[in-house]
Structure formats: C-alpha cells, structure tokens
Amino acid sequence: MSDPATKPFLAHRDLWLLALCQGLFLTNNVVFIAINGLVGLSLAPAAWMATLPVTGYVVGGALAAGPVARLQARLGRRRCFQIGLLVAIASAAVCAFAAAQQNFWLLVGATLVAGFYNANAALYRFAGPELVPPQYKERAISWVLAGGVIGAVAGPNLASATRDWFVVPFAGAYLCLVGVALLSLLAMSLIRFPAPPAPKTGASTGRPLSEIARQPVFIVAVLCAALGYGVMNLLMAATPIAMQMCSHPFDRAALVLEWHVLGMFVPSFFTGHLIRRFGVLPVAGVGVVLNLACIAVALSGVDLMQFLVALFLLGVGWNFLYIAGTTLLTEAYRPEEKNRAQGAMDFCVFATMALTSFGSGALVTTQGWTWLNLGSLLPMAAVAAGLAWLATQRKTQVA
C-alpha cells in the first residue's frame, strides 16, 4: 500500500467522495433557498414571515452545532455524518408533506429539524484536511468546498424542473431531496476517515473555549466566516422574493441562483493556492472588496443582469472570506481542541445566518431591495476592520 504522505493530492479518493457529499449537501441547500421563501410566501399568515422556513433551517443548525461537535467527538466523523443524512431524508419527506397539506408551521418545524443535517455537513470542510497529509491542508479545504459546484448546477435546475410535478408547487422538489440525501449516504459509507485518537489517561484536554476565543486569530476567523456568510445569506435568501416583486419569472431567479452558487464554489479550485501564494489576509481582503462590488451593482438597478452579476460577485466574495476564515481557524486550536473550536465557529456562523435569513424576508418585503443592500455595508466594514487589526498584530509580533 502506498504511503498517503507521498500520494499526489488528487489521488486521495476519500477527499473526492467527501467533495461529492459536499456537492449533494449544497444541492439540498440551494433547493431550500430557491423554494422555501416562495413556499413560505404562499403559506405564511403574513408576508414578512415568508423566509421563516429558511430561518428554521439555519436556527436548527445553530442549535445543533454544539451537540454535533460533542457527538463527533464521541462517535467519530462518519457515524455522525451518517446520522445527519438520515435526518435529512426524514425532514425532506416531512417538508413535502407540509407543502401538500398547506401547513406553514409544519414546514417551519421540518426545516428546523433539518438544521441538524446542516450543522453536520458544515463540518465537511474541517474533515477534508484529515484525509490528506498536512502539506495539503489549504487545498483540501478548498477542494471539499469546490464540490459545491455540483449543487450550483443541480440545485436550481432541480428546483425549476420539479416545480410542477404535482398539483402543489415544489412538493416534488422536496421529494427529490430525499433521493439526494440517499445518494450522499451511500458515498459517505465509502469514506475511510482516520480513527479519532484514543484518549490518554491524564492527557490534556486543551484550553477552555474562553481562552481559545480570546485569540485575535480566532476572532478574525469568526468575523470572516460569520459576517461573510451573514451578508451572503441576507442577500441570497431575499433574491427569489425580490425578483418576484420585480416581476421576474421563477426560471430567471433560478438562473441567478445558479450563477451565484457557481461564484461561491468554482473559485474553490484555486482559492487554497491563492492563500498559499499571497497569504490568508490579502485573500480575505479581496473577499471584502468583492462584497462591496456586489452591493454597488445591486444598487444600480433591478434588471436581470444586475441581479445576476451582483449575486455572482457575492458568491465569489463569500468563497474568499469563508475559506480564509476556515484556514485562519486552523491556526487557533490544538488537535485536542478542534471539536470545541470548530463547534464555536459554526455556532457563530449559524446564529448570524439565522438573524439574516429572517431579516432578509422582513426587510425585502417591508423596506425593499435597496435598503437590504445598504444594510450589508456595516458587516463588511467590521470584517475589514478585523483584518486590519490582525495584520497589525502580526506585524507587531514579527517586529
């Protein structure tokens, strides 16, 4: 058997399978984003509640982030990931039933439960580096996230193609997600994750989370990932509703989301290389600039191309910030601290997404698309300030 340390990067079969699982996870997420707000708008007691099914998925992820981290420490990566996929199968079936029954609150409850899958799959990016030698760490994170290209193509097209399968719009899309999760469950069963190290008697369990979280690198990592994801989610979740309010048909909204998700994940094929060559902070800085460019384009008008270009730039900006944040986080913890540090970051990400997914529906239906974009400037300013602070800290340490 060949030594894994000497194998070429692309020869690691398990990494490819994990990237496939990531792609199927993003297929699920893109379908949820594309249809949950519209289904919610048709069922909700009030228009401002339209994105509650999207919010439920994110809140479920936030609530599950801590338990999932502990479950992974106890059961290992694969078994915990498989449990998450079983939850995905069950919750997608309940979503289809809720849509058929025109039951808004059952739909919200089903997406809340589906958040357990969301929290599990969010850890795929951390599991990737464990499947390859240390010198491939940044590339492994990027390539796992690059699997999302599958979701970029499959998700919008699946949502559009299955919209009218049944009398109830989009019930067929939810049922298709059952099959997507089953395929992911099969791929997950073939991945050989390294066994977690056996606990040693008297061995250190690492620093408390409060100490880990006080590090500048941890703070900025969370700022990049959480606020980058928050702004992306704020604008993405509102896009189908905003386009419908601007009289664009659903197939155009699906096209915009397809290009948005391509922007999110196609750069993953080279983001890791950019980080190794130019450094993590410059790449994150470019992510901030791309987000600002997105806002500028979005504010310039509401034609199809303006939505498409803005959401594409938003996707690329998210990619740079998210991968940079994830890479920074790996500098903030020791091996025995990984579950609590990763769980803390993902809790912050999900909590931010919960606020923005709910806020997107309320803001776009009451204040409009323009104010939604203007509100995105403040989080980006906070990320830029954090990056400048960490860069100053590192220059001081070198001096």
Regions found by a protein language model. Name each.
Residues 23, 104-119, 306-320:
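Hydrophobic core of transmembrane alpha-helices in multi-pass small-molecule transporters
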Residues 160, 178-199, 386-391:
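C-terminal membrane-cytosol helix-exit motif in multi-pass small-molecule transporters
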Residues 1-12, 193-222:
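Juxtamembrane intracellular "pre-TM" segments in multi-pass secondary transporters
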Residues 64-77, 266-280, 364:
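Helix-to-loop junctions at the C-terminal end of transmembrane segments
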Residues 139-157, 348-356:
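Glycine-rich segments within core transmembrane alpha-helices of 12-TM secondary carriers
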Residues 36, 118-132, 320-333:
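Intracellular juxtamembrane helix-capping segments at the cytosolic ends
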